[in-house]
Each structure stands twice: as C-alpha cells, then as structure tokens.
Amino acid sequence: DFEVFIDPDSDGHNYFEIETNARGVIFDLMLDKPYRSGGNFMVQWDCPGLKTAIHCEGTLNKSKDKDKYWSVEMAIPHQALTMNFNNPLKAGNTWRINFSRVQWLKEKGPEENWVWTPTGRIDMHMPDRWGYLYFVDKKVGTSQDELVYPYNQAIYKLLWAMFYAQQDN
C-alpha cells in the first residue's frame, strides 16, 4: 500500500493518515496522538472530497506473472484537514508530512518499507521525525526561497528525544 501522513500544525497530535492500495481501496483516519503515546484513532473521519487515481502495469494477486508497477495520485482537499488546527496554506508556514510504501514481495516473508523521511524505526507514527512541507507564494522556478525551520526546532528535537527515551525504558 501507499500511505500519506499529514500533521498540519506540526505538534505531533491530531494528524491524518490516508492509505490506498493497487485496487484503489482507501483507508483514512485521524489520530489524536501516536499509538505509543496511548493515542486513539478515529476511523469515522473520512477525508471528504479526496480524489485518487490508480494505474497498474500488471495484474493483481497473480504471483506467477511479472508485474511492472502501480502508481497513485491523490488530491487531498485542504478543507478536509482543518480539524483541530490553525495553520493555513500560507507562504512561510510549514506542515509535517511523510509518505510510506509497504510491499510484501515474498509469501510469509517480512514486508519491505520505503519512506520519504526515515523515522529511524519501522514506525510511521513519529510525526516529529517527518519531513517538512514548506509553503511559498511564488511560481516554481522563479525564486530561491529557503526553507526556514521553526525557531524552536532544536528544543523541539531535544524534548522529543527525552520523550522517546522515557517511552523506551
């Protein structure tokens, strides 16, 4: 499957997960906080207005033939992600985001995981370790905007490291 994780206010709480597979089956939910922090998921949240397109070069569930690939496009409406946050799509704002691809290549074998921004574990529910989505208001290729990390990023990373150290003991 392919998974998208979005934390619009970058606080590690009230974030969204949207998954799809090669058949186009959607699984979407909102989490109040990560599972390892005692988080709860809300599967009743359906990403309103979500549009997806799946393209498959090969067959599904026929292990005897050779498949090439499958791809997905998603259009996620901004309005669907406005629950519990106030960080609009405005130049200079950042969101935390990550992408994950999980594939089972061998029967009874372990899954293979690819991610956009590694979290250091096989656990995507670590929003503090996701990448940054930085909004600009300029046309692509017309300027060299530089990503400005949040002013408190060093403290933020230290506090999360302390949190994980407590969780691991």
Feature map (PLM): residue ranges:
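Structural preference for beta-rich elements and adjacent junctions enriched in aromatics
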Residues: 1-163
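Alpha-helix exit/C-cap motif
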Residues: 165-169
